[in-house]
Amino acid sequence: MRIAVDAMGGDYAPLEITKGVYKALENFNIEIVLVGNKDQLDKYVKEEKGLTVVHTTETITNNEPPVAAIRKKKDSSMAVGIDMLKKGEVDAFLSAGNTGALMAGSLLKIGRIKGIDRPALAPILPTLNGATILLDAGSNTDCKPINLFQFAIMGNVYAQKMLNIDNPKIGLFNIGAEEEKGNELTKQVYDLIKNSHLNFIGNVEGRDIAYGVADVVTCDGFVGNAILKSMEGTASVISSLLKQELQRNLLTKLGAILIYNGLKNIVKKMDYTEYGGAPLLGIKKPVIKAHGSSKSKAIFNAIRQAKTIVEMDVISHIQREIELIGDDISAAK
């Protein structure tokens, strides 16, 4: 298995990217292609079995227009990595760079799964009862009912493979649990999912997500991104508050020692870097978006996630599911 990694994308590239890559090579039996500017990588990269460096001369920054950047900067680390995936030279591509450019490049060069109108970002969120898949988390700010229905179908397959759940519970994000709640979009989506083969549990509210009420939560990208950032911020604040309180005086420091293992487990469970990145579900090959602020730990886990997606053949399973229920999707449009 070969995974291409964008060495130049993200706030801490290329140092933290390369550190995550080396950790992955130590732990997994895979090959990694590090795509980036060799002049900048030379001080961080050493010869390692399973590692190849592909030199590029350009980088796409976060403030560039996505479509224009991916078309103009053909020798950027992101564009070259996507091209390698398209040609079959690698099995998956991972980047912590410009989200819009990654989506645009994936759509233009690789394309969508037949039957999927819009791909979706699908991060795995930590919850009290395990984990929940959220989609879309920011790719599509304006959606039609069919888009959210398709997100639910893809999320269902992804949960089966990645969370090992036979019949995932599917929830529709809304402002209330009652069927009649919400706007015109959510009301139409409710009917589509309710009348499908999915294990639909109805509407879920913001507080339900953290409790793990649903295995998959579908929503538009505007709402999904707000949920994602809110949960990340809440987890960070709780972690900081715990540290502050436990360092307050000698007594609290002693107490922290006694409950250290428990606290460590809590912090780890709330840490988004443990869950890797967000795949672009709906693209014909595995593309994973890592958080822009990813450090080595997050990159390592995103590579682990990419490896699992390839091993579990997630994309093919989504394709087959869409083919099987194609008539239902067509009828819903």
From Swiss-Prot:
One term of GO molecular function: phosphate:acyl-[acyl carrier protein] acyltransferase activity
Entry-linked InterPro entries: FA_synthesis, Phospholipid_synth_PlsX-like
Ribosomal protein in keyword set: no
GO BP, one annotated term: phospholipid biosynthetic process
Domain of life: Bacteria
Class of the enzyme per the UniProt entry, highest EC level: transferase
SUPFAM superfamilies, sorted: Isocitrate/Isopropylmalate dehydrogenase-like (SSF53659)
Protein location: Cytoplasm
One Gene Ontology CC term in the entry: cytoplasm
Enzyme Commission number(s) from the entry: 2.3.1.274
Listed pathway(s): Lipid metabolism; phospholipid metabolism
Reactions this protein catalyses: a fatty acyl-[ACP] + phosphate = an acyl phosphate + holo-[ACP]
Keywords annotated in UniProt: Cytoplasm, Lipid biosynthesis, Lipid metabolism, Phospholipid biosynthesis, Phospholipid metabolism, Transferase
Quaternary structure (record): Homodimer. Probably interacts with PlsY.
HAMAP family: PlsX
Function description: Catalyzes the reversible formation of acyl-phosphate (acyl-PO(4)) from acyl-[acyl-carrier-protein] (acyl-ACP). This enzyme utilizes acyl-ACP as fatty acyl donor, but not acyl-CoA.
Family to which this protein belongs: Belongs to the PlsX family.
Identification of the protein by name: Phosphate acyltransferase
